Amino acid sequence: MTATIIIIAVTSIVSFMAFNNSTLLHRFIFYPPAVKRKEYYRFFTYGLLHADLGHLFFNMFALYLFGTAIEGVLVYAFGQAQGTLLYVAMYVLGLLVSILPTYIKEKDSPAYRSLGASGAVSAVVFAYILIYPMNFMGIVFIPIFLPAFLFGIIYVVVSFYLDKNQSGNINHLAHITGGVFGVVFMFLIFSMLKGINIFNYFIQQIQISSWQDLVKFGY
């Protein structure tokens, strides 16, 4: 069983439990005043919770699609044990790093709460974009597909806009921070452990690819 499947299973089990258990929900949710009381575990446990079934499904579906690929890349590059450890480290640290700017911004807000694995999933998705920039990506139920690097650019721009305008209850800042972390993490582990500049690999893939089909329609 892969680490991706284990993460999905654990997250799904805890999320389903919390749907009907308000005590568990309040104990695990990211709540700045509680963190200030040194409940630091909340930097991680909020990622085990989701607002509803749809929220859980989309996060875990994305993690399955992109996490399976990135876990495979890391296992191939670093071996089974080290590759799996690095993958899990990226996911867990993604939870922490993606919520830190939100904590700084909302640390004095007693009404603020956050939950969901989106920040860590964004780290995995952007790691995928870095490795496979010319693979086509799209949004579920919208039959338009773009090269991954273009999708990533649009995603970041839209997220910045929505965060600036405080649109909805989605933590767009965590998505952006998580995505940046995923790219930085991949760059660091490949440069430090393999002596490979993954950014050069990213640019080369874009340069050698055909630009005739930048957009695909349909499934």
Each model region followed by its residue ranges:
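A detector for small-residue-rich transmembrane helices and their helix-helix packing motifs
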Residues: 1-219
